[in-house]
Amino acid sequence: MNKSYKWVVKAGSSLVSGNQDGVNIDFISQLASQIDFLRKNNQEVIVISSGAVAKGMNDLGIKKRPDQLAILQACAAVGQRGISEIYQNTFEKLGYTTGQVLISHDDIANRTRYLNAKNAIEALLDLGVIPIVNENDCVATEEISFGAVSYTHLTLPTKA
């Protein structure tokens, strides 16, 4: 792999969630190992991750997915911190720093905010940081009920 590519890896809730403290640590470790290989071969990698609501439910002892939006948002707020910490701890063992990027639908709909998010991701990559992108479920409304949205278009070239 001589030519540099930008890889976008989507880690959905069913992969990220697990029995070990609400997170599938084995999956995240394997993912980190594969990303380490790519990075050592001059490849850029962005991780789009889900799992904050499931992690928060685990941390709060909630067994059944709540119907109330505010409770789902609270679970996301609690879980996102833990998900981010697990990614950082896992990648740190391999010598990498991760950066948490939380995106909402409003960020995508507003051109200025969209470009700011895209530029932040590009800056993280330029600094050698692995961006971990997740939907900001704490402020999400309807979309939290339907699951995570892919933000791969943030990584594509755009016209300013």
Language-model features: locations:
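Glycine-rich loop at the start of a catalytic domain that most often binds anionic cofactors/ligands
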Residues: A52-L69
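Ligand-binding beta-strand-loop-alpha-helix segment within the catalytic cores
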Residues: R65-A140
